[in-house]
Amino acid sequence: MQGLNTTPVHGHTALFGVYGMLGIGLMLFSLRALGQGRRWKEWPVRYAFWTINVGLALMVLLSLLPIGLLQTWAAVEHGTWYARSAEFMQTGLTTNLRWMRAFGDTVFAAGALLLGYFVLGLVTGTSYTKEEPVKVNEFDYALPLGEIHATAAD
């Protein structure tokens, strides 16, 4: 199974699960701190999370994994050389399965665009609610950092 389409299954799911989600989480954590306690409209982040994950699952389950399993079967029956050959990869079934990946890619891209829309909204102010900023301890994050440090020193 090594070197067949099962390798991208592992690469796409594991790398995005570890580094992609970690990166998005760190970005959102940092953006939350930069927002000085202002409340977010959370629906774009929620929908972005689910569409990105559903898109990745569709990409893997509709295309990469089925092709990888077909290649594994072909490698067991005829050898790895055949499973990786153009003769096998250009059959009608594998071609259709490769095109099925577009569904998952489209859903994934919609989630990425929604996340981008949310981040752009943080810059323009449209991703914030009109509620009062969140207060932590006696300090209000809506104060500039210099005033927070000056107040803490008193």
Could you say what each language-model-derived stretch is?
Residues 1-7:
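Membrane-interface interhelical connector segments
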Residues 7-35, 40-90, 97-127, 140-145, ...:
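Hydrophobic cores of alpha-helical transmembrane segments in multi-pass integral membrane proteins
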Residues 131-134:
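Peripheral terminal and linker regions in Fe-S/redox and tRNA-modifying enzymes
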Residues 136-138:
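Aromatic- and carboxylate-enriched substrate-binding clefts and catalytic-loop regions
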